[in-house]
């Protein structure tokens, strides 16, 4: 109860079509560009990071490398290695600090990633308008309803289809400012001043001194277990709790690499409090709860339970009991477990892994066996001209130009009008080639046909001329070097900003009184 003011999020609720339309803008680009620190040297992004298959080991090797300072970023999480110290930094109110201008910049970036091979933008004027104007207005600084009250909520609502990339942008802004300040220590007053410069709140969740020494100590201290001798563990191997997206590191003597285990707090909470079947559409199946138990207990062992003897034994026994129950009732075990990835909240982490077998030393070794990095998702030489134009638009603020939508609408218009011109030309050629079938037809009918042909040809010519003129104007506007000067919103002081849950333009010290009046909770004034 003492932390609900800082932990509560504005969960964004909207009709399904709204979620779908924003997803249609973000997902095609994000899903086809899983480039991250694991497959591109020097890339700080942890997007699509998987700790298994040697993923966490590559991060540990990155930490052990002597070069520093250095940083990684994932949504509202920032990780910095500075002075042999590991810092895990979290945006305290990442969603609340997001502005519409932030989301417009993110949408501008997404739209300008989507180009066809011949250089046409893969969106039209409608999508550009929705992405740049409508979506940010719906998601950021929107209003919520409590009974018959309409209350302003600041920042973006958590749970929208652009939450990740918006938070990723905010974290990147923090890192950019950190680089401009010549990378001060995260626990210094200079680093903390970034909050006031950007209006973005953050806090250091965890710091580990002598991070390289602690990681190296894991090697000689590894205890016999599934991945160190191929036996059931009798004693836990030590871990370093990096808080790397919830993962800690331990060492495997058999594989000779660092392997992931879920942070203790998360692991034991997950063991104590089951979430239930992940895919709610499966809940009506008879026997699904027992199948869920099999998957859940085996998954708990895979994500780190194998390292803790008591938890490992309990999960192993419970999974075995659930299997025997399904077999005794005559339920097709293989049919249930074929959908295991939709049963457990851990499903996405085990890509290409078959969980139908009980966890063994061999299966754990297979899950953690390193695989070569995926090549960058680039199938042809990158044309950096477009990237430079986008970068310039972001730096100068042209992407905020509501009249021109930073040229996105103009480009989309140019594309559609050029298509109109091509169609008009084709129609004119078609009309020009067409002739009456009967050369001896009545002269009146032939004159009517000729008049119709001339009228359509004239229309086609006007459409083509208009399209080319508009295309020329659009391209000139896009190539314009004029800088748009936006009206920046007043940057909120993090110390006196309204509470993001309630808002109402009230200082934070009065927010609890508003909550008490509306909700019967909190501290009265």
Curated annotation (Swiss-Prot):
Protein name: RNA-directed RNA polymerase
Major enzyme class: transferase
Lineage: Viruses, Riboviria, Orthornavirae, Birnaviridae, Avibirnavirus
GO MF terms held by the record: GTP binding; RNA-directed RNA polymerase activity
Record-linked PROSITE patterns: RDRP_DSRNA_BIR
Annotated localization: Virion
Role: RNA-dependent RNA polymerase which is found both free and covalently attached to the genomic RNA. May also contain guanylyl and methyl transferase activities.
Organism: Avian infectious bursal disease virus (strain 52/70)
Catalytic activities: RNA(n) + a ribonucleoside 5'-triphosphate = RNA(n+1) + diphosphate
RdRp catalytic domain span: 72-272
InterPro entries in UniProt: Avibirnavurs_RdRp_C_sf (IPR046814), Birnavirus_RdRp_C (IPR046750), Birnavirus_RdRp_palm (IPR007100), Birnavirus_RdRp_palm_sf (IPR046812), Birnavirus_RdRp_thumb (IPR046752), Birnavirus_RdRp_thumb_sf (IPR046813), DNA/RNA_pol_sf (IPR043502)
GO biological process, one term: viral genome replication
Disulphide bonds in the chain: none
Posttranslational modification: May exist in multiple phosphorylated forms.
Gene Ontology cellular component list: virion component
Coarse class of the protein's main subcellular location: virion
Domain of life: Viruses
This protein's UniProt keywords: Covalent protein-RNA linkage, GTP-binding, Nucleotide-binding, Nucleotidyltransferase, Phosphoprotein, RNA-directed RNA polymerase, Transferase, Viral RNA replication, Virion
């Amino acid at each position: 109860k003492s932390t609900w003011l800082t932990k509560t999020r504005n969960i964004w609720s909207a009709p399904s079509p709204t979620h779908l339309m924003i997803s249609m803008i973000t997902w095609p680009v994000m899903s086809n560009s899983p480039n991250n620190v694991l497959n591109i040297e020097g890339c700080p992004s942890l997007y699509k990071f998987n700790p298994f298959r040697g993923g966490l080991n590559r991060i540990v090797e990155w930490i052990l490398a002597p070069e520093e300072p250095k940083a990684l970023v994932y949504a509202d999480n920032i990780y910095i290695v500075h002075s042999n110290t590991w810092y895990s930094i979290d945006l305290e109110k990442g969603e609340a600090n997001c502005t519409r201008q932030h989301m417009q910049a993110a949408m501008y970036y997404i739209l300008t990633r989507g180009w066809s091979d011949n250089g046409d933008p893969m969106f039209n004027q409608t999508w550009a308008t929705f992405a740049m104007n409508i979506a940010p207005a719906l998601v950021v600084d929107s209003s919520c309803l409590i009974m018959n009250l309409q209350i302003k909520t600041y920042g973006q609502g958590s749970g929208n289809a652009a939450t990740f990339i918006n938070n990723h942008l905010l974290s990147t802004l923090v890192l950019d400012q950190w680089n401009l300040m010549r990378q001060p220590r995260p626990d210094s007053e200079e680093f903390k001043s970034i909050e006031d410069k950007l209006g973005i709140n953050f806090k250091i969740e965890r710091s580990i001194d002598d991070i390289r020494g602690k990681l190296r100590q894991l090697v000689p201290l590894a205890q016999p277990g599934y991945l160190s001798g191929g036996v059931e563990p009798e004693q836990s191997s030590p871990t370093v709790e990096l808080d790397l997206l919830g993962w800690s590191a331990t060492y495997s003597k058999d594989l000779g690499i660092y392997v992931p285990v879920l942070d203790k707090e998360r692991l034991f909470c997950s063991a104590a409090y089951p979430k239930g079947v992940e895919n709610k559409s499966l809940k009506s199946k008879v026997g699904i709860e027992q199948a869920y138990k099999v998957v859940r207990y085996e998954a708990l062992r895979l994500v780190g339970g194998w390292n803790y003897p008591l938890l490992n034994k309990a999960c192993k026994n419970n999974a075995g009991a659930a299997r025997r129950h399904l077999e005794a009732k005559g339920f097709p075990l293989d049919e249930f477990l074929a959908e295991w990835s939709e049963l457990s909240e851990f499903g996405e982490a085990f890509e290409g892994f078959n969980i139908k077998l009980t966890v063994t030393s061999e299966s754990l070794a297979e899950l953690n066996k390193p695989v070569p990095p995926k090549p960058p998702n680039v199938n042809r030489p990158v044309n950096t001209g477009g990237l430079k134009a986008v970068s310039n638009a972001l730096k100068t603020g042209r992407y905020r130009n509501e009249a021109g939508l930073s040229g996105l609408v103009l480009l989309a218009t140019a594309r559609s009008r050029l298509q109109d011109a091509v169609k008009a030309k084709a129609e004119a050629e078609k009309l020009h080639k067409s002739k009456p079938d009967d050369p001896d037809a009545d002269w009146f009918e032939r004159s009517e046909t000729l008049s119709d042909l001339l009228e359509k040809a004239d229309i086609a010519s006007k459409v083509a001329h208009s399209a080319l003129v508009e295309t020329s104007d659009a391209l000139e506007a896009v190539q314009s070097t004029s800088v748009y000067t936006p009206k920046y919103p007043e940057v909120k002081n993090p110390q006196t900003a309204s509470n993001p849950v309630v808002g109402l333009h009230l200082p934070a010290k009065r927010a609890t009184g508003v909550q008490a009046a509306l909700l019967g909770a909190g501290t009265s004034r």
